[in-house]
């Protein structure tokens, strides 16, 4: 299922799907959305997921406030030129926000094209 309006809360999810949610995957979202969308993602996910379920993010991240490649740095600049609220997020800041909603970073997986998959687990704090 695709949530198109990322800032709209609560998310409108058909009732027949609510009981079958086992995890949430967000691909290439938080760098092309405002920081409020990231907050909304964690907030709404925390309401929908049970303890032990996962939220996975995929996309580019800075590590320790540093870009992992020159191409990611150039991509970040191009995003900010399109919209000043967009940009490659620092993983530490994202995980800090996740912690506020009872998610803990469980696994970080390096992916092709200087991207990462980050798996958060609910209720692991």
Q: Where in the sequence are the language-model features?
A:
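Core SAM-dependent methyltransferase catalytic element
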Residues: 101-125
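Short conserved loop adjoining the S-adenosyl-L-methionine
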Residues: 9-19
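Conserved beta-strand signature within the Rossmann-like core of class I S-adenosyl-L-methionine
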Residues: 51-65
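Conserved small/polar residues in nucleotide/adenosyl-binding loops
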Residues: 1-5
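Conserved acidic residues
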Residues: 22
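A conserved beta-strand element that flanks and buttresses the S-adenosyl-L-methionine
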Residues: 25
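Conserved Class I S-adenosyl-L-methionine
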Residues: 68-92
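A short, conserved alpha-helix within the catalytic core of class I
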Residues: 32-48
């Amino acid at each position: 299922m695709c949530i198109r309006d990322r800032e709209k809360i609560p998310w409108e999810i058909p009732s027949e799907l609510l009981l079958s949610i086992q995890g949430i995957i967000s691909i290439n979202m938080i760098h092309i959305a405002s920081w409020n969308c990231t907050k909304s993602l964690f907030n709404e996910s925390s309401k929908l997921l049970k303890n032990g379920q996962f939220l996975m993010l995929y996309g580019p991240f800075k590590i320790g406030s540093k870009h992992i490649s020159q191409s990611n740095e150039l991509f970040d600049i191009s995003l900010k030129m399109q919209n000043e609220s967009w940009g490659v997020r620092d993983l530490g800041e994202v995980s800090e926000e996740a912690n506020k909603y009872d998610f803990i970073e469980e696994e970080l997986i390096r992916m092709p094209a200087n991207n990462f998959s980050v798996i958060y687990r609910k209720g692991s704090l």
